[in-house]
Regions:
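The feature marks the mature, well-folded catalytic cores of soluble enzymes
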Residues: 1-169
Length: 169
């Protein structure tokens, strides 16, 4: 079936593997008024005859990154979009995505869509890419705080993250 937009990262399915190594699709409620986009994960699941699980979390894929080993991150927009408590959001992430460590950070860009993919990306279970701006940039301090945050936490292997910066003036 058709969709309403081309933002597949925002509304597409998230694949999970359970303890029996069985693959399924987890579907969040898409945070935009685009019903055909919101239905895309169900359509993919039906087409591929893949198990489907729906979570009550409202979000967009652009505000979610995961290392594939139980560590994920989003901006605090995920709390603002949901009527459930922050603890309930974390529990849904654990129950449906296997996320035992969920980092939720203030959006350092503080503009537009507040998606984490506007300034950060897990490149692997050990590497994270963070936006870098000149010291004269309005959000310089906030972006550096995010980089410092990741420099002071550990990855799934219990090691410091390897931080890569991309200059985006």
């Amino acid at each position: 079936g058709g969709t309403d937009s081309y933002w597949t990262r925002d509304y597409g399915p998230w694949w999970v593997v359970d303890g029996n190594r069985e693959i399924g699709i987890v579907d969040f409620t898409y945070n935009r008024p685009r019903p055909n986009d919101n239905d895309a994960p169900t359509k993919v699941s039906n087409y591929l005859d893949t198990p489907y699980f729906a979570t009550d979390v409202i979000t967009a894929g652009g505000n979610y990154m995961t290392d594939g080993y139980g560590i994920s991150a989003s901006t605090t927009l995920v709390y603002e979009e949901n009527s459930m408590s922050n603890n309930q959001v974390h529990q849904e992430m654990l129950d449906y995505y296997g996320v035992h460590t969920y980092h939720t950070l203030e959006d350092p860009n503080d503009e537009y869509i507040d998606h984490i993919d506007c300034w950060g990306k897990f490149l692997s279970p050990q590497k994270v890419l963070i936006r870098e701006v000149p010291t004269s940039h309005d959000q310089y301090e906030e972006i550096e705080e995010v980089a410092d945050y990741f420099e002071n936490i550990v990855n799934a292997y219990g090691e410091p993250w390897e931080i890569f910066r991309v200059y985006t003036p």
